[in-house]
């Protein structure tokens, strides 16, 4: 993989990871256009550059995400409540993460086989687009209430759909899950971003460990520049993508993303029917 190819893939990752459009489907198209061979390192690279995207969430939402100890005298100034609120978020994220961890571990081999099917990715991307055309009407009402522990768990169950249906988009599944629990679009999207941090961090570390077992520390030394550049680019692009998405979603809803998914999914299907070789 060249530096230029790494930059392009990182741009695709940063643009699509937090949007409900399936980063996997876009990676397939980008790799196919550039003629990137689907080696074990390339597959690991597409997962490991998620670390840069994770950092973008932590930077943008650092005041809401990070939890610091509160000095005793600060409790009287109301900061203790703020501390507990942030700590409460961690518990909700942990509860939401549990279903994916359990099911991902139990069905790891099956999930890997499904992820290796471009047809599955394309069809799910296409059908998910059709569904998104109706999301705004299906979940038009929201109580704009806070995310409770039961709601967090249900959103975690929705996240599992993205594990078993590659091409669905983790972002789409969790945001729709949040709206199904009557959260506002913005609240559902932001919790989806927060949940992405432990989910994607776990996937990144697991992939890095598997790559280490396969090629040892030398494989990281050999591709260190590519990995570094990829993560930096993914971080910068994801920052812009998240800011855009929150504003766009609040004003216009999901319909535009539905049409876009149909277009991309249809393109993948046409390419495969035309005999173009694509690999995950």
Curated annotation (Swiss-Prot):
EC number(s) reported in the record: 3.6.1.27
Enzyme class: hydrolase
Cellular compartment(s): Cell inner membrane
Membrane spanning stretches: 1-21, 41-61, 87-107, 115-135, 147-167, 186-206, 225-245, 260-280
Recorded topology in the membrane: Multi-pass membrane protein
Additional note from the record: Bacitracin is thought to be involved in the inhibition of peptidoglycan synthesis by sequestering undecaprenyl diphosphate, thereby reducing the pool of lipid carrier available.
Name of this protein: Undecaprenyl-diphosphatase
Source organism (scientific name): Porphyromonas gingivalis (strain ATCC 33277 / DSM 20709 / CIP 103683 / JCM 12257 / NCTC 11834 / 2561)
Gene that specifies this protein: uppP
